[in-house]
Structure formats: structure tokens, C-alpha cells
């Protein structure tokens, strides 16, 4: 690992000569405050801390090796250059515990930030990955010269804590071989805490779960060019309070589950197919998106409750490929107590009617128009997940289980009720 404090006088002089404006938000230099700048690249092989009173710059791909713990203080700002990214290997840990008033922010080091400016953040654990020998799978999205094999048999594996964290302008998928998206969790175990995380303006997939048993809570995905919340290869965790907003970027889906015909779950090779349990999810699409708001395919299973699927100009729900359709017919893949409010709510396949399946009265789902979503309109770029007075989604929910993870008091459909305090104070929505 290379850690080198930069000379602030040189940095500030260069910024001034370049005529760059807005440096307070881009370079972590607050008005009246000069923070030391620390450049980081390569391997971290021992316990290391990144401090809030400095600006950390990822000049290359940073790898936390097995046995080491990377601690990031609340309020720390991490800037990434084009080749920058962070990988936490199996047996390593990250303790990134921000707070509502002092979130940890990973963002672009560019003066004019844009989606895809840098690679992203990867947690690689030792929990099972479906269809892989021994539950282990080499990662296929790493830059040249960097290797990692994720997965294993430790379902309760602990990769650390990722709490009150924003990841912005990541997911580079051009010019460089392989992109992890914004935030990728591969083979991450249930001992890992992922709570209050925003992934914003991503060039590829925003949040990607590959295998593992990790559970996630208070997740906000805003603006992305591929899939918002993606799972495959045997993810069997839980999730609650998940908001996915395509915004003004032309993406594909809000949720994509399964890997299509390449999915190990499709041919019976895998012994632990994807089977998440989700409550309180809001998916907000856009008029010109490429796919349905929810695309369920491959051999995925899963149970989803209290979902608000809204405003896609294409469709709300598509269940593709025979194995996923078979799982749906057998009750292994299910959506209940949910609302679909899109221009066209269902994609019916030749041998499977998503509309008949979803609107079976036993499922207690509702088929509404896009104008009946109960969500306020976007104003000045702000993103609202709270429900308007009288919204259909304020009734008809089923209580989540009281199991120590879920909040059973969330008696509304979607990620938020009439107010949305859990996504306020630590989130941000910069265009550049």
C-alpha cells in the first residue's frame, strides 16, 4: 500500500490555475478548512484507519487483505480516481460506521463528476455462492493483476460493518476490463452489517448481490444505467426499506433477479438457489427505461411483500424463463400485498401470464395506473419516497415478522410511509 500526504499548497495552486470551481464539494476542502490529503493504492495488509480530518484519494485499486481490518471514521470523504476502487477480500473486514450527521462518502475525484468515474466498492466474503465448487467462485470484475475468490461454507461470515455510507459516480464499465458496479457483495455472510447505504449515479449495476447470506436495510439506489438492485447465484438474505429510483438516467430494471440462461440455478447444478425475503420496497421507474421495473428470471426464488412498483414506462413485472415461472407457480417465488402502478403493469409470456399470477386474489396485490402510485412528483431534482395523503399504499400492507431484523411496525406498502426520516439527513443527490 502506498500512502502519501500531498502538499496542500501545490494542490490548491493547481486548482486555482485550472479555474476549477466547487472544490469544497469535489475535493473535500471546506471553506476555511484545509484537510491533509492522503493518496492510497495497492494492498492493505495490516489494520489501518482512514480519518475524517483528512481527504483520502484512491489513486488505484485498493485491496484489504485477509487478516486486516480497514476502519473508516464517521464523516470521512474518500475520493477515487479513474482506476480507483476498493476490494475487501475474504478474511478481511471493513468497519465503515458513519452516522446520520456524519456519513462516510465515496465519490469521484474529478472536478466535473459523472457516473462511471471510478470502479466501485466490493465486499468479498466466505458465505456460499450457488453452483460453484465448494461454494467458491473467482471474481470476474477485477482489474488486471488483481485476483480474489469469494464464497465458501461460512454462512455467518463477518466482512464488517457498512453503515451510513454513500457511494457516488461509480460503476465504470468502459475502457477497463470488468466493473463491479457501484456496490457489489459477493459471498458475503450474515455476520456482516449493511444498513443505511446510498448508491448514487452509477454507470452500470448500482447494488449487486452475488450469493451469500447478508441482510440489508435502509438501502437507497438513485439513478443508474443498468439494474438498480440485482441478485443472483444464491443470495439468501433479508431486506427491508429499499428504495430504487431510476431518476433521469435511462436504466434497465429496478430489480433484476437471476442470471438468465447462465444461472446455475436453471439447470439444477446449484444446491442453494437465491431465496431472499424482502419487505417494504419502492421501485420508481422512468418513461424510457429498457426493461420492466422487476425482472425475475433464471432459477431465482424469493418472497416479496409490501412492494410499491411504480412509474415504469415499459412495465411493472416480468417473470422470464421456465424455471422462474415454475418457481412462481409452486409458491417458491412470490409477491404479495403489493401495488403495481405503471403504464403497463405486467409482461405476459407465451406460457406464463404474469398478470393472472400476480392478481390472484390470494396474493392481495393491486393493479393501479401510474397516476395512482401515491408518490409525490419530483421537484428540483429532489427524490421523494414518502406517500401523499390518502395514498392506496397507506393501507393493505402485511406486518413484517418480528424476528429481530425486520421492523414489524412498518404497516405501509413501499419503503416509506407518510414520512421518510430514515432516508433524510445523510443522503444526497448531486448531478455532478
Question: At which residue positions do the language-model features occur?
Answer:
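C-terminal motif of bacterial Sec signal peptides marking the signal peptidase cleavage site
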Residues: 19-22
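Extracellular beta-rich repeat passengers
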Residues: 27-71, 83-93, 97-99, 103-204, ...
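Post-signal peptide N-terminal segment of secreted/secretory-pathway proteins
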Residues: 77-79
Amino acid at each position: 500500500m502506498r500512502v502519501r500526504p500531498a502538499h496542500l499548497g501545490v494542490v490548491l495552486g493547481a486548482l486555482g490555475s485550472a479555474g476549477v470551481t466547487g472544490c469544497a464539494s469535489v475535493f473535500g476542502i471546506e471553506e476555511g478548512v484545509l484537510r491533509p490529503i492522503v493518496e492510497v493504492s495497492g494492498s492493505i495488509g495490516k489494520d489501518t484507519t482512514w480519518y475524517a480530518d483528512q481527504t483520502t484519494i484512491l489513486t488505484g485499486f485498493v485491496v484489504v487483505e485477509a487478516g486486516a481490518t480497514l476502519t473508516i471514521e464517521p464523516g470521512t470523504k474518500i475520493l477515487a480516481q479513474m482506476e480507483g476502487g476498493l476490494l475487501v477480500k475474504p478474511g478481511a473486514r471493513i468497519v465503515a460506521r458513519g452516522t446520520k450527521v456524519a456519513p462516510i462518502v465515496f465519490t469521484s475525484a474529478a472536478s466535473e463528476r459523472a457516473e462511471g468515474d471510478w470502479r466501485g466498492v466490493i465486499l468479498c466474503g466466505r458465505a456460499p455462492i450457488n453452483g460453484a465448487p465448494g461454494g467458491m467462485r473467482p471474481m470476474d470484475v477485477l482489474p488486471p493483476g488483481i485476483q480474489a475468490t469469494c464464497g465458501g461454507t461460512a454462512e455467518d461470515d463477518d466482512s464488517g460493518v457498512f453503515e451510513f455510507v454513500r457511494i457516488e459516480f461509480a460503476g465504470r464499465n468502459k475502457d477497463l476490463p470488468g466493473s463491479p458496479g457501484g456496490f457489489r457483495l459477493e459471498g458475503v455472510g450474515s455476520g456482516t452489517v449493511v444498513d443505511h447505504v446510498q448508491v448514487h449515479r452509477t454507470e452500470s449495476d448500482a447494488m449487486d448481490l452475488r450469493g451469500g447470506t447478508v441482510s440489508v436495510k435502509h438501502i437507497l439506489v438513485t439513478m443508474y444505467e443498468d439494474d438498480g438492485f440485482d441478485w443472483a447465484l444464491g443470495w439468501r438474505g433479508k431486506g427491508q426499506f429499499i428504495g430504487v429510483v431510476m431518476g433521469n438516467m435511462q436504466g434497465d430494471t429496478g430489480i433484476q433477479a437471476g442470471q438468465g440462461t447462465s444461472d446455475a440455478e436453471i439447470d439444477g447444478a446449484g444446491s442453494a438457489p437465491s431465496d431472499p425475503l424482502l419487505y417494504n420496497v419502492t421501485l420508481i421507474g422512468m418513461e424510457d427505461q429498457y426493461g420492466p421495473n422487476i425482472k425475475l428470471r433464471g432459477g431465482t426464488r424469493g418472497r416479496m411483500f409490501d412492494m410499491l412498483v411504480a412509474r415504469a414506462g415499459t412495465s411493472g413485472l416480468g417473470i422470464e424463463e421456465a424455471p422462474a415461472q415454475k418457481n412462481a407457480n409452486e409458491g417458491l417465488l412470490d409477491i404479495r400485498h403489493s401495488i403495481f402502478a405503471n403504464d403497463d403493469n405486467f409482461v405476459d409470456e407465451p406460457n406464463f401470464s404474469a398478470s393472472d399470477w400476480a392478481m390472484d386474489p390470494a396474493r392481495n396485490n393491486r393493479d393501479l395506473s401510474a397516476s395512482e402510485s401515491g408518490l409525490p412528483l419530483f421537484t428540483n431534482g429532489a427524490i421523494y419516497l414518502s406517500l401523499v395523503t390518502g395514498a392506496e399504499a397507506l393501507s393493505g400492507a402485511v406486518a413484517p415478522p418480528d424476528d429481530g431484523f425486520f421492523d414489524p411496525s412498518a404497516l405501509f406498502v413501499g419503503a416509506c410511509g407518510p414520512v421518510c426520516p430514515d432516508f433524510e439527513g445523510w443522503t444526497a443527490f448531486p448531478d455532478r
